[in-house]
Amino acid sequence: MSSAKEQSSVTAALQPEQWTTSSNEALKLFVTNPEAALNFQPTFTYPIFGDAETIYGYKDLDIFLCFDHYTFKPFLNIKYSAKLTDDPEIIDIKKTIDEFLPKSTIFKDEVKWVDSIKEEKDNGYKIPGKLIDSFSENDKEYDIYKIDLKSDNGYELHQRLQILVLLFIEAGSFIDAKDELWNLYVLYEKDNKSTSNNEPSIVGFTTAYNYWKYPGAKKFDSTEQESRIKISQFIILPIYQGQGLGQLFYSHLFDKWLAQDDIIEVVVEDPNESFDDLRDRADLKRLNTSEQFDFKAVTPKVDKEWVEKTRRALKLEKRQFARLLEIILLYKLKHGYPGITKRDVRLFIKKRLYDKNKEGLATLDDNTKKDKLQTAYQALEDDYYRILGDLKLNIKRENDEEETDTVSKKQKV
């Protein structure tokens, strides 16, 4: 930048730390709306700036990446007080980031960015997709849109959003949005203020892939096609986190897929711990109200046919349904439900752990094998109780039901 000092790298050779900046700290993200610019920091920057997540050769470096709350049009600005000039390790920051941003990104000229956003809106910008669901939470209203990736505006919106995948999902990568099997769902917060222009704000998004499932020879010639939905990327902007919106977003999407006959299963690609937590709690709450799920059937001797039939009806993948059954068993154990013993629950969970790790355990002697299984079980039990927290499941004891029946009979007399 012309306003910054340019210095020879020889002068900095003995003090490289003064010219080295954490890229996680230098990159400052903003979402701007008519009232404020909301700031948040990235979790990762290594996909852009390398594994060390550092930038060498600049002093007092700040990288500003801003997005409009509605169109998500990006603005990039880079500021520093001094820059080294003759070191091959020094990167061109703008050129480096440009590889991950759409061509519509405005650089440095903030007035031009504001004018370009206004121009888009004046030309009738609308959310490029179909409204598929709505919900309310904490006196606010939210809409879920399925974005039309075949349209120019839909594809462009994805191009604007996708850099967040690199910044907030470990090992995240871009998808081929031109592949027709990819779907993009975006969550918006509606603006119902009488003094505003009623523009919604992007809260988060998820990408999901449709996998066609071979139905077997009997159904192969059928006109009905079955598919699996695989959730690939799932992001709630940090400025909206901590409000339960991710869980609601996931649950409302799952309910939509549950109602579609052509979708037979919903799976998740390499979920991290935070998404596992969100998913476990959301799925448990769905089971709480599902007419297809019988909590009484969940015992350490649960019928395998019931498990498979119920899992298919609920469109849950095997690993996830097994986790839910184990969590429910521990819930029953914790609350003293009859017929549930700690030993039986422990053996039930250990069996799945053993089957999952059979090859690795096969080379160990019996004592080591038992120790490994016990350690794995204890860690899982602790994690399940953490996930349960203060969640209340809709499970009635048999004596509770008998008491209810007695009261009902007395009322009829």
Curated annotation (Swiss-Prot):
Xref: Pfam families: HAT1_C_fung, Hat1_N
InterPro entries: Acyl_CoA_acyltransferase (IPR016181), Hat1_N (IPR019467), Hat1_N_sf (IPR037113), Hist_AcTrfase_B-typ_cat-su (IPR017380), Hist_AcTrfase_HAT1_C (IPR013523)
GO BP term, pick one: DNA repair-dependent chromatin remodeling
Coiled coil: none
Cited Gene3D superfamilies: 1.10.10.390, 3.40.630.30, Histone acetyl transferase 1 (HAT1), N-terminal domain (3.90.360.10)
PANTHER family reported for this sequence: HISTONE ACETYLTRANSFERASE TYPE B CATALYTIC SUBUNIT (PTHR12046)
Main location as per UniProt: cytoplasm
GO cellular component, one term: nucleus
GO molecular function terms noted in the UniProt entry: chromatin binding; histone binding; histone H4 acetyltransferase activity; histone H4K12 acetyltransferase activity; histone H4K5 acetyltransferase activity
Cell compartments where the protein resides: Cytoplasm; Nucleus
Catalysed reactions, semicolon-separated: L-lysyl-[protein] + acetyl-CoA = N(6)-acetyl-L-lysyl-[protein] + CoA + H(+)
Chain positions covered by the region annotation Interaction with histone H4 N-terminus: 51-53, 209-211
Protein name stated in the entry: Histone acetyltransferase type B catalytic subunit
Subunit structure comment from the entry: Component of the HAT-B complex composed of at least HAT1 and HAT2. The HAT-B complex binds to histone H4 tail.
EC number: 2.3.1.48
Residues binding acetyl-CoA, per UniProt: 234-236, 241-247
Site label Interaction with histone H4 N-terminus, positions: 182
Function: Catalytic component of the histone acetylase B (HAT-B) complex. Acetylates 'Lys-14' of histone H4 which is required for telomeric silencing. Has intrinsic substrate specificity that modifies lysine in recognition sequence GXGKXG. Involved in DNA double-strand break repair.
Organism from which the protein derives: Candida albicans (strain SC5314 / ATCC MYA-2876)
Keywords of the record: Acyltransferase, Chromatin regulator, Cytoplasm, DNA damage, DNA repair, Nucleus, Transferase
Family the UniProt entry places it in: Belongs to the HAT1 family.
Active site location: 269
